[in-house]
């Protein structure tokens, strides 16, 4: 009887400790349905305060082909900001050899899809691809976060800010430090593996706390 009771107690504890991980595709998409979660994460990526992100709207995630033989693109999450800038988020758990080519395809398609025939190029707004990787894509350094832009090869001068790629490599996260930047805190949240880790981070960031509440429901 005591052994049966012990087993039942353990099963109850396991159920209470269970939590869906953000690296699971479905969980990540559900997280981004929450406007406050989007606000916090986007602010961290753009280096601003959440209050500065006035509005975010989810867009359809299918990039339709222009011609019958063209390839479709299917994004995880696509968002438009109040200023018209667009961001697409992709959670990629396993390494694939064509990842770089695929994100360039998605980014280019997202940029060109802004215009219809006859519309002015002046209407084009900034497009940002955010790749959240649960594997190491750049093996030659230990930088876990990087922003890639168009720039002059010789001078390093930025050519345009209309296209950006943000790469978050969760496997490269260093040991925790004091006063970490917002994007590093979000990366820790996205890569966490237990309820205990989530709860600890939630105490340090209001928007991460909202994320924990959302995935716990």
Residue ranges of each PLM-predicted region?
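Elongated, amphipathic alpha-helical interaction scaffolds
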Residues: 1-212, 216
């Amino acid at each position: 009887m005591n052994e049966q009771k012990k087993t039942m107690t353990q099963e109850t504890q396991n159920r209470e400790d269970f939590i869906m991980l953000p690296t699971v595709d479905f969980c990540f998409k559900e997280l981004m349905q929450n406007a406050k979660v989007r606000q916090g994460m986007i602010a961290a990526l753009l280096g601003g305060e959440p209050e500065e992100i006035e509005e975010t709207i989810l867009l359809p995630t299918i990039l339709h082909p222009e011609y019958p033989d063209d390839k479709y693109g299917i994004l995880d999450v696509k968002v438009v900001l109040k200023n018209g800038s667009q961001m697409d988020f992709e959670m990629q758990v396993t390494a694939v050899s064509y990842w770089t080519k695929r994100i360039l395809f998605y980014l280019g398609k997202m940029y060109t899809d802004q215009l219809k025939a006859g519309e002015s190029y002046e209407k084009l707004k900034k497009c940002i691809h955010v790749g959240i990787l649960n594997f190491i894509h750049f093996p030659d350094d230990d930088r876990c976060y990087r922003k890639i832009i168009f720039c002059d090869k010789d001078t390093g001068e930025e050519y345009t800010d209309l296209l950006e790629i943000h790469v978050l490599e969760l496997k490269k996260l260093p040991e925790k430090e004091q006063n970490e930047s917002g994007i590093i805190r979000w990366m820790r949240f996205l890569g966490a593996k237990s309820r205990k880790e989530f709860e600890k981070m939630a105490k340090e960031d209001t928007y991460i706390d909202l994320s924990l509440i959302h995935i716990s429901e």
